């Protein structure tokens, strides 16, 4: 670990450098903390010689634009791209646990990987490559250290940290191999075995994927005429031959375009063929001819009642080389056991009859079908609600923006409103129920990198200490969808303003005519736990500050003029471009916290200051 003096800069833009983590072939990796929000990030500072190359920077810019749109646990998500003192740097999520390259991970395990462990790693890599190929990106430049394994709670997760960038620094990678005198030969050979000569985007990845899978199975890369997995691992249940041949085909057009479907189990027929092959090769043994053995014995040794096998019986026995018998019970199986040479003729006849009865019986084979287990869906955590009595109220203000005029009367029916904004622990259950961060119309519900909810190892988790904080990074679609999921709705703009003012006409802030930092969370560095500040006259918490709250209405600049003419339960314009947000947030100034202050944004907009609370009709 190096100190800040070793790095040569205490701050890099808005980020305070904590220490240097290492250096890759194209970046210097630093751990930093944002000076305002106090959150840690991994900064990848571009090396000076690369930053001065105009062709490289143009290609680098194109890759960054594509990567910024991706959202996959196997890719280091880009939070921000900035420049300081002429050096470009990327801001990515902090990795708390060390990351091992694939070869380092395999060396750390004192045994060979099991088939299911190989399936897990290969499935993750295939899913990741299929995803990036669909987005127009590819790894292209491969070696065994291109794949990294992130150990999270003892579970290996596959990551490609240099995805998109490796192809930009091919010459630098080759120079690195040549300068490494100790491992030069093995590294160059490894690169040759992982690449083809076609150079078509995506097909290089397909070939390398097949070669890496082969390496996980055998411990070496395929070269020349190599053995197929079925010849060595006959007891494996997955069809590795199909995957290897689909990826390592000599003809580029025959290589698979999608990788994940290649990971499949063997068919029932293939498994049966393996069983029969194993039986024939390992279970059969030479049985001496009882006729010959009896002929070689003296006549005095032959027991009374024994008869020699006729020529016809011997002939039929030569044709019967192997018989596979399925017994329906243990008793029947025991009946077919080979009797000792001392068995009587009656016992041999009983054995023949038992064997014949098994052979003529219709075999019955039933397929095992695992009973489906219906997993219980997550249940919502409901919020206590406050009843807002209906009546005539005043809304608007003369001290704000033009869209707050005119001050006018509105008539509202009684309704319920949540006492606090929806929290992370409540919203995560909605995401688990949806199974995605998008709704059925592909509208984004939440952007995880702008929230305190993360997806790790395929599971959604909340950052420690943020379960009771209001959910942020949520779109209007996510807020509306959550409300519908629990049988509620979003409040209208009129309902929200009247609820914030506590029913008091012309009240400036929810807590009174003035507001201090002891009364609300504003102009700070982050959200706070809900209900941390005193409630307003209605008993509602966080109506000022903490997070902006989505409302049901479309925003209309002059809608108050229409509302003054039609005061009965106003609900905003019939259509529009923006949806209404109210209440100010943790980084707002005082003016944004006024009860009458209006804010708006696109319904699909994502921000670390946007949250919501729910309302409900009386009936």
From Swiss-Prot:
<feature type="active site" description="Proton acceptor">
    <location>
        <position position="141"/>
    </location>
</feature>
<keyword id="KW-0418">Kinase</keyword>
<dbReference type="InterPro" id="IPR011009">
    <property type="entry name" value="Kinase-like_dom_sf"/>
</dbReference>
<keyword id="KW-0808">Transferase</keyword>
<keyword id="KW-0547">Nucleotide-binding</keyword>
<comment type="similarity">
    <text>Belongs to the protein kinase superfamily. Ser/Thr protein kinase family.</text>
</comment>
<dbReference type="InterPro" id="IPR000719">
    <property type="entry name" value="Prot_kinase_dom"/>
</dbReference>
<comment type="function">
    <text>Together with the serine/threonine kinase PknD, may play a role in the specific interactions with host proteins during intracellular growth.</text>
</comment>
<feature type="domain" description="Protein kinase">
    <location>
        <begin position="15"/>
        <end position="302"/>
    </location>
</feature>
<dbReference type="InterPro" id="IPR016187">
    <property type="entry name" value="CTDL_fold"/>
</dbReference>
<keyword id="KW-0597">Phosphoprotein</keyword>
<keyword id="KW-0723">Serine/threonine-protein kinase</keyword>
<dbReference type="GO" id="GO:0004674">
    <property type="term" value="F:protein serine/threonine kinase activity"/>
</dbReference>
<dbReference type="GO" id="GO:0106310">
    <property type="term" value="F:protein serine kinase activity"/>
</dbReference>
<dbReference type="InterPro" id="IPR042095">
    <property type="entry name" value="SUMF_sf"/>
</dbReference>
<dbReference type="Pfam" id="PF03781">
    <property type="entry name" value="FGE-sulfatase"/>
</dbReference>
<dbReference type="InterPro" id="IPR005532">
    <property type="entry name" value="SUMF_dom"/>
</dbReference>
<keyword id="KW-0067">ATP-binding</keyword>
<dbReference type="InterPro" id="IPR051043">
    <property type="entry name" value="Sulfatase_Mod_Factor_Kinase"/>
</dbReference>
<protein>
    <recommendedName>
        <fullName>Serine/threonine-protein kinase pkn1</fullName>
        <ecNumber>2.7.11.1</ecNumber>
    </recommendedName>
</protein>
<dbReference type="GO" id="GO:0005524">
    <property type="term" value="F:ATP binding"/>
</dbReference>
<dbReference type="GO" id="GO:0120147">
    <property type="term" value="F:formylglycine-generating oxidase activity"/>
</dbReference>
<feature type="binding site">
    <location>
        <begin position="21"/>
        <end position="29"/>
    </location>
    <ligand>
        <name>ATP</name>
    </ligand>
</feature>
